[in-house]
């Protein structure tokens, strides 16, 4: 990508929102645009980062034999009435955007249990087809009364939501545990240290829900965290009468070894049991030809929150001043940022074209109106993890590659540059 094509704006770092500096930088660059509170448009950097995260999510879900589908975002009231959730979501909790016209009443999907149940029951007619898990990645809508933190709590957002179908409770537990492992693999590949947080859902008999939290000072949630096991517990556990017994079952951890930390929820898994299958009268046939309800689970990952967490947890500070942010290499939209002095313009273009020919995504700062020093100062604005400077000391033999996160530098011969980035 030629930087001149991004048309980024000039930034005044004295005017940065220090609480959400990375997202505010993208706002001021024009790479994130707020149409209204909680409603955003996304530029090149955010969109490419989202696609890279999507790719990892899809790969891990597909490896686990999950099936990608797509449900409608505009959903008729009739299916929500079947689950008794229309009034809950439009009046009691007032979460769902909804409309009424000549065709009927509709809601903009905040979630998709109803669609998934109907879709699954229409296809999964026999116990022989179970277990099956469907997933989709797309936009969701929620009437957040207090939209805040840019993409930490917006009104429209992209998420992955999955829905599993099993024949009995035992197999539902197996799927739940399998999805736990899938999630841990996803977050590991993305580059986020995720904390599985046990949430008992009000009963002490077994794990029926689980959150995947990232520790960050910007998080609204407060969890109890054990560093040695990397396990978290919701503070609601403290209200349980036999809380010590419950906690001690979790790898022997103890309350007095846990600390309170701020965190943000990036994903969650729930065992739904037969709730939706029973309410909506959706069944499969068992070995004896009898109709039986599906045991279901639902699983969600918020892509916008993941991106917000990544860039806010990787702010680049030099000389006690915010300079930008650095995106982890695995998911970075552009792996390397090339800047050059005028005398090395041809060499820089040659490097840029070589990298692109080998499918290595990179940025070249081709803005001829800026001197080299100003170009270097702008490198961290777009989150690129690696920097190559072709300045006056460049010898046309070796490239000096700087890791913007650590400051470490590698010297790589020209002929080895492609292998370095692979």
Regions found by a protein language model. Give the residues of each.
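Short beta-alpha junctions and helix-cap segments that line functional grooves
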Residues: 374-376
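A short alpha->beta transition loop at the rim of the catalytic pocket in nucleotide-sugar-dependent
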Residues: 383
